[in-house]
């Protein structure tokens, strides 16, 4: 089953033939390679000839010798089509030594359109980004959204059941092929997890204590949506008999963020319009992977919903922060250009005290930006002093204004 990732595909189409390097980043197995294949199919259906497309996956042994940047450049240069646009696809390019040199040399040639993918943020770290600064656009890819998951099942009915499936079966695209086979899904997710830990983190970062790395990751997975600091993690693990210092925890967190397995949400002072350095939160790329690592017993449905909403806001192109308003906290402040949106996320607000608790931070914000409470309650939409309470599943499916 090949799931059409329409929103990502449209982004690539919009940048076709533009003098920008298109860089698609995201966790392993989120669908980057399939997206590239779909885009190549689209090109062929829209007047591009096969010889104008050069596609290389650097995790394929057939191309192993091309991980040397000189050989790669020679290979590509020999295959450029004179007087026509050549579309170059470089999948998992982080395996190529000094790859920016290749991209830089190709970029200055006429009629070359470059697309690259990578499974860790290191490929766009400061020194690399400097070499291609101002000449690339980054498209950040995530596993399936709830809407994509629903569409891939062929029906938009039974939203409640499918939401549970979406969480438990995983949002990684191939997990749909394994639906109904929980042991196979677990093995599949375990394989992704171990590849990330071994290939993308331990080997490249030269980390010598894989058990401690996994302990840090488990702690973050177990505390999604809770304020965390490196010191708090270090103190907790040390008190449990696994001694670790703050600097090591910081290094491990950086590596996990770089591999797209966890995402940080920095705190933001809404009234002072300042970014705060302390007690941010972390969210995981896939709840199914969290279940795999921690077990189903760790349900924590409220924070799981919060995690799903956070990822959806990222998909929609927002920078997402945890809001601080006086002594109150707003779950999410979502910013994009001049637009700002505020979100509270709760399983239910049918209880009057819970509703007031969720409303209070939003009512404390004295601006005119939209404010929402997202809840799993199936009650009709309601407004409280301009604050909209809407069903979270409807919001995830794009069924609300």
Indicate residue ranges for each PLM-predicted region.
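Domain-level recognition of nuclease-like catalytic cores that cleave nucleotide substrates
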Residues: 378-401
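Accessory nucleic acid-recognition modules appended to NTPase machines
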Residues: 180-340
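Conserved lysine of the Walker
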Residues: 32
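Short glycine-rich substrate-engagement loop in P-loop NTPases that contacts/grips substrate
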Residues: 55-83
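Pre-Walker A adenine-sensing motif
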Residues: 3-17
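Interdomain motor-coupling "hinge/lid" segment immediately C-terminal to the ATP-binding subdomain
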Residues: 119-121, 125-227, 260-263
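Hydrophobic positions on the alpha1 helix immediately C-terminal to the Walker A/P-loop
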Residues: 35
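Hydrophobic anchor at the beta1->P-loop junction of P-loop NTPases
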Residues: 24
């Amino acid at each position: 089953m090949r799931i059409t990732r329409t929103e990502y595909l449209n982004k690539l189409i919009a940048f076709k033939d533009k003098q920008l390097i298109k860089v698609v980043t995201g966790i392993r197995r989120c669908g980057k390679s399939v997206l590239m294949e779909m885009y190549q199919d689209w090109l062929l259906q829209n007047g591009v000839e096969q010889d104008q497309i050069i596609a290389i996956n650097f995790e394929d042994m057939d191309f192993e010798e091309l991980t040397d940047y000189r050989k790669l450049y020679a290979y590509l240069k020999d295959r450029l089509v004179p007087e026509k646009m050549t579309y170059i696809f470089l999948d998992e390019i982080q395996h190529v030594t000094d790859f920016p040199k290749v991209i830089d040399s190709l970029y200055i040639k006429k009629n070359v359109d470059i697309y690259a993918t990578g499974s860790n943020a290191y490929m766009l770290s400061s020194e690399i980004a400097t070499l291609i600064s101002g000449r690339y656009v980054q498209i950040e890819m995530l596993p399936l959204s709830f809407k994509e998951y629903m569409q891939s099942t062929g029906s938009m009915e039974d939203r409640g059941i499918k939401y549970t499936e979406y969480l438990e079966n995983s949002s990684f695209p191939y997990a749909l092929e394994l639906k109904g086979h929980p042991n196979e899904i677990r093995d599949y997710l375990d394989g992704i997890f171990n590849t990330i830990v071994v290939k993308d983190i331990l080997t490249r970062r030269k980390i010598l204590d894989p058990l401690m790395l996994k302990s840090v990751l488990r702690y973050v997975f177990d505390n999604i949506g809770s304020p965390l600091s490196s010191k708090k993690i270090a103190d907790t693990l040390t008190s449990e008999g696994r001694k670790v210092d703050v600097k090591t925890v910081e290094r491990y967190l950086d590596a996990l963020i770089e591999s797209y397995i966890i995402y940080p949400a920095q705190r933001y002072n809404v009234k002072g319009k300042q970014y705060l350095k302390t007690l941010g939160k972390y969210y995981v790329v896939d709840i199914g992977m969290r279940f795999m690592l921690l077990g189903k017993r760790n349900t924590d449905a409220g924070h799981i919903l919060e995690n799903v909403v956070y990822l959806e806001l990222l998909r929609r192109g927002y920078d997402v922060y945890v809001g601080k308003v006086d002594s109150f906290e707003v779950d999410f402040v979502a910013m994009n250009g001049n637009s700002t949106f505020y979100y509270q996320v709760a399983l239910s607000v049918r209880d009057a005290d819970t509703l007031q608790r969720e409303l209070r931070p939003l009512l404390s914000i004295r601006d005119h930006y939209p404010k929402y409470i997202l809840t799993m309650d199936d009650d009709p939409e309601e407004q409280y002093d301009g604050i909209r309470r809407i069903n979270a599943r409807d919001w995830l499916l794009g069924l609300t204004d």
